[in-house]
Each structure stands twice: as structure tokens, then as C-alpha cells.
């Protein structure tokens, strides 16, 4: 796999992915991030839908509770996704309050444990999306240490959002309607 279309909340829905699939048969598509709590409590089933023409398509999960991630991984596999991606890149305040997204880059051992358990619970691939760094932790050593610990989980695919995640203050990119 060479090309992936990054998920973006409120943009990469099934209609967007279908259009992207018409443009390219080679790109790997992802859902927008779905929090484990939303999936467990049934608040997001409209976001889970996809058209069979979208394959290959992965689902992106947000969470940090190992048992919740395992439960959601099993549901996602049953739903027919080709891959599960753990979001360790979203810097939003709301996501941070839920203890997932980019703030998890400060907890590589927890991320590794989550990914290892997710991977052991399903037969489809599990991957990770992370940032180059977060806040002042944006040097090569920070990313190298993070990847070195997380790769012990056995995952094979790291998707790097090639920007630093800003946890304190505004993110440097803003999308307006």
C-alpha cells in the first residue's frame, strides 16, 4: 500500500470515500475517527456504514482503554472492515479530555499494550496513526523512542501525520465551512 487518504472528522464519510474510490482504485481509505465509547454505546452506527465498492477500507478508532479497544476491534472486524487504525494523532481538546488521540504519544507503553491486545483479538491488520511529535516534543529522538516502544506490539504499519500536534492552544490548521 502506497497511498492512504487521511480521515478527517465530518468529511470522510461514506459518500466522500465512494467518490475517492471512483477517482482511484489504489488508495486505501479510512473512516473518520470513531471514539470507542460511541461504538460501544451505539451512538455512531451511521458512521460505520460503507459501500462494498469502498474496499479496501479501514476504520479509525479513538480510545485508550484496552478492553474497550478490544471490544470495538472485534465489532469492526465483524462489520467487514479491512483494517483497524488507532488514532494517536488528533490534538483536539475534546479528544484529549477522553485521554486519546495525540496526547497518547506521551504514553508509548500504553499505546503498545492497546495495539498488541487489539491485534491479538482480530484477524485483520491493525495500524497506528501518529504525529511527528507533540508540543515541544518534536525532535527525531522523541519520534524514534515512541516508534521503538510501540513497534514491540507487533504492528507493521505506522502512518505518520507529518506535522507536530499542538496540544496547548490552537492547531496551526483550521477548516472552515
List each language-model region with its residue ranges.
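N-terminal amphipathic alpha-helix/helix-capping segment at the start of soluble metabolic enzymes
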Residues: 1-6
Amino acid at each position: 500500500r502506497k497511498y492512504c487518504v487521511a480521515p478527517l472528522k465530518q468529511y470522510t464519510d461514506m459518500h466522500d470515500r465512494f467518490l475517492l474510490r471512483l477517482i482511484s482504485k489504489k488508495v486505501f481509505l479510512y473512516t473518520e475517527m470513531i471514539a470507542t465509547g460511541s461504538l460501544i454505546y451505539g451512538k455512531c452506527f451511521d458512521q460505520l456504514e460503507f459501500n462494498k465498492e469502498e474496499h479496501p477500507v479501514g476504520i479509525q478508532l479513538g480510545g485508550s482503554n484496552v478492553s474497550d479497544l478490544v471490544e470495538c476491534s472485534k465489532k469492526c472486524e465483524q462489520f467487514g472492515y479491512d483494517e483497524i487504525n488507532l488514532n494517536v494523532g488528533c490534538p483536539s481538546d475534546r479528544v484529549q479530555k477522553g485521554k486519546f488521540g495525540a496526547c497518547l504519544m506521551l504514553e508509548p507503553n500504553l499505546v503498545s499494550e492497546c495495539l498488541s491486545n487489539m491485534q491479538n483479538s482480530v484477524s485483520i491488520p491493525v495500524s497506528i496513526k501518529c504525529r511527528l511529535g507533540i508540543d515541544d516534543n518534536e525532535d527525531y529522538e522523541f519520534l524514534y523512542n515512541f516508534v521503538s516502544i510501540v513497534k514491540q506490539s507487533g504492528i507493521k504499519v505506522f502512518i505518520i501525520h507529518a506535522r507536530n500536534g499542538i496540544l496547548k492552544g490552537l492547531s496551526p490548521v483550521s477548516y472552515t465551512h
